Curated annotation (Swiss-Prot):
Location, primary (coarse class): mitochondrion
Location in the cell: Mitochondrion outer membrane
UniProt-recorded name of the protein: Mitoguardin
Region of interest called Disordered, as start-end residue ranges on this chain: 47-73, 210-239
Record Pfam families: Miga
Transmembrane segments: 26-45
Binding partners and assembly: Interacts with zuc.
Membrane topology listed for this record: Single-pass membrane protein
Biased composition (Basic residues): 47-67
Effect of G34D: In mitoguardian; progressive neurodegeneration in the eye caused by mitochondrial defects. Abolishes localization to the mitochondrion
Protein task: Regulator of mitochondrial fusion required to maintain neuronal homeostasis.
Organism name: Drosophila melanogaster
Length: 525
């Protein structure tokens, strides 16, 4: 052992200031040699370690939540939370971008077009399919829409407070942003049909391969059945026939019956009044301000126009009886008065304005002016349906479905009291109506009287639909549902008799009385 160790170690004093025994020297030498050997082995093994296989990308199995499903009414309330949730750090943006890439580069659609295998230490480059690239574009479009929504919200409330008074330029700017968002939402829906819908060409190419395999399997089964002399069912020959994939592919092969609606001939022999309306439409074309075939549950626009002609004739027939006209006038006054009372509003100014409107309509000398004024607003016929139901009520409901963003910004602001919200909302509605009233061509015409009534009803309806009062909201929604149900009844073959004007008019009046009674019962609860 002394031959192995250096001479200086044997002397025991040249390296250490104290004497070391031989056993201690052997232990120290062994430890040093072991550590050196382990370091050499670890470096060698690390160099020979094979590269780790790339991690498989996550497969995208579900449809993403579309941002365009939100209604335009939620832009102001949601945009703030989006802005706070979105981080500007490089790490956050990198992670978000990698998530989108992993989702888009998964095994979707018809598969990859080509793969380039590189050597160890270099990345694997995968050529993306058309569907994957399209989905990445959809994600980018969703990000763009988020920023545009935040821009709209920031313009309305630059300092966190609602901007109640805006100039004409600001309103025009916000309107253009909303139009831009609407076009972006439409583009989002179209891209979903191209890249996510099961009926897309991208999915049909995949299904064509499955169909070819199924046809080959069917041919083999037929040959087996002819040899054995037994009749085998489709399910018996294919053990995977009831699987989820086969069921999904079978659903894609089922024809959409709605595509053949235009080729189905419906017999209208039992509806003589409707038949005459169809002939009238073929000869003269029924004029219409807005086609509401979907709202009235009509299968085609032609059916809606023919039924619209019947409805106009029915109301003209009903108003020949002064008693019917007086009943409709009294019913409208009672319903609107009850609404104001349920909202704790004073009804005096409303009743004065309502009586002025009734007296104005009863004067036959005013009707040429009324017709001229309404024709400028594209009202095609001077009937109760066209003026009251279509032009006033249905358009008002449409405005309530898409209120101005300034209104939603005030109502949905959690830092404002309910009293201040209601006052601000009423002031905003009054200012808009007064501005419209000043621009009227006929200062004392029909629209002027209508705006007087709207100054009392519109703030209440807006507060009822968007305010925090649950009872008032329930009443307003019930009022709208009953009116829409009444319109659906008079346009229905099952609820109304399109046989003669007399019978159809009787059904229309009966439906109106039923809905008025329902509203009265609801308001009295």
């Amino acid at each position: 052992m002394q031959r192995v160790m250096p001479a200086s170690w044997s002397s025991g004093g040249s390296l250490l200031p104290f004497r070391v025994s031989t056993t201690t020297k052997v232990v120290l030498f062994s430890l040093t040699a072991g550590v050196a050997l382990m370091s050499v082995l670890s470096r060698f093994l690390r160099r020979r370690k094979p590269p780790r296989p790339p991690r498989r990308a996550r497969k995208y199995t579900g449809r993403r939540n579309r941002n365009s499903m939100r209604s335009p009414n939620d832009l102001i309330s949601i945009a703030g939370s989006k802005a706070s949730a979105r981080s500007g750090s490089p790490v956050g943006s990198t992670l978000a971008y990698s998530d989108r890439l992993s989702m888009a580069s998964g095994s979707i659609g018809v598969g990859v077009l080509g793969v380039q295998n590189a050597g160890p230490g270099s990345s694997v480059v995968t050529q993306l399919t058309a569907q994957q690239l399209g989905m990445m574009g959809m994600e980018a479009l969703d990000t763009v829409i988020n920023f545009w929504e935040d821009a709209l919200a920031a313009h309305y409330s630059p300092g966190g407070l609602p901007a109640l008074l805006t100039t004409a330029e600001d309103s025009e700017f916000c309107r253009e942003i909303q139009n831009l968002l609407e076009m972006a939402y439409t583009l989002q829906e179209q891209s979903e049909l191209l890249f996510l819908d099961q009926r897309s060409v991208l999915f049909r190419e995949e299904h064509s391969i499955d169909e070819a395999e199924e046809e080959a399997g069917e041919a083999d089964d037929d040959r087996r059945s002819r040899k054995s002399g037994s009749v085998l069912s489709r399910a018996g020959s294919d053990p995977n026939f009831d699987s989820a994939e086969s069921f999904a592919s079978a659903l894609d092969q089922v024809a959409d019956l709605r595509e053949f609606d235009g080729f189905i001939e419906t017999s209208y022999e039992e509806y003589p009044l409707f038949q005459s309306a169809l002939k009238h439409h073929d000869e003269y074309t029924v004029p219409c301000r807005t086609i509401r075939a979907e709202l009235m549950h009509c299968s085609t626009d032609t059916e809606y126009l023919a039924k619209l002609h019947c409805v106009r004739l029915a109301f003209q027939f009903l108003f020949k009886d002064p008693a019917v006209g007086q009943w409709i006038c009294d019913a409208g006054r009672q319903i609107l008065t009850d609404l104001l009372c349920l909202g704790d509003k004073d009804t005096k100014e409303f009743l004065v304005g309502y009586e002025d409107m009734v007296n104005y309509l009863h004067d036959s000398n005013n009707w040429p002016c009324i017709q001229m004024e309404l024709e400028q607003r594209n009202v095609k016929a001077m009937t109760f349906y066209d003026i009251c139901l279509d032009f006033i009520i249905l358009d008002s409901f449409k405005d309530l479905d898409a209120p101005p963003a300034s209104v939603t910004a005030v109502v949905q602001n959690r830092w404002l009291s309910n009293g201040f919200k209601e006052t601000a909302l009423t002031t905003a509605v009054w200012s808009v109506l007064k501005a419209k009233k000043r621009m009227l061509k006929f200062p004392n015409g029909f629209m002027s009287h209508f705006y007087v009534i709207s100054e009392q009803i519109s703030p209440l309806m807006a507060w009822g639909f968007f305010g925090p009062n649950e009872n008032l909201r329930d009443i307003c929604h019930y009022f709208r549902e009953e009116l829409l149900a009444f319109l659906g009844d008079i346009f229905s073959f099952q609820k109304s008799r399109f046989t003669t004007i007399e019978e159809f008019s009787q059904d229309v009046l009966q439906h109106m009385q039923t809905r008025v009674n329902n509203i009265g019962v609801k308001f009295s609860q």
